[in-house]
Amino acid sequence: MRDLVKHEQFELEVIDRLQSGRFLANLIFGGGTMLRLCHGLDRYSVGLDFWVTKDMDWPEYYRRLEQYLMQFYKLADSANKHFTILFELKSPQYPRLLKIEIRKETRVIKTDTSIAYSPNSTVQVMMKTVALKDMMKSKIEAFLSRGEVRDAYDIEFLLKRGIPLNADNETLNKLVTGLKKLSKTDFSVKLGTLLDASKRKYYQENKFRILEMHLRDKLKGE
């Protein structure tokens, strides 16, 4: 658990430095780490995910960002790929690598202005984030694409926050089918390692009961 606390401090340190270096102007913070740092998602995640608001000179952006990050960290990996820019940062102050992924595809999505913060850090950063309604859409797409238990967890988290799960009947049925495919190992190991001990037992026993009931109710209503 201490490693995860340190990793959260690492995330905020890097976000703060990206902001100070003016690398976030055209980026939108998304994914599970955004939900945790900006909206209180109660599971751990290990990477920083960004979308873009407009196309950029990617070779130049990558070059500048790489040189900037190398002032502070060792780069375990870095790549300017066709669809994404990737960095893996290593620091002697922190036990884990930190992955940064910037998706080059320009997406028309709604954004909010949010503060990334943690009770484990004194750093706070105001930044553009994916609006929660669009985050719900993204998480549904992700779960249907890769079937990862963490995406289902995030969908239920957003649902409990009052974010509507707007989807057609076909998508609702696919979600129900996907939830049924999740195994005991998904809950005990994959999800269990991302949760505090106090929450692990609940999800092992109840799984995504709230989400499943909501999906059934929506299907009955239609």
Task: Name these PLM-found stretches.
Residues F29-T33:
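Glycine-rich beta-strand-to-loop/alpha-helix junction loops that act as flexible
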Residues M1-L27, C38-G40, T53-E222:
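Structured mid-to-C-terminal alpha-helical surface segments
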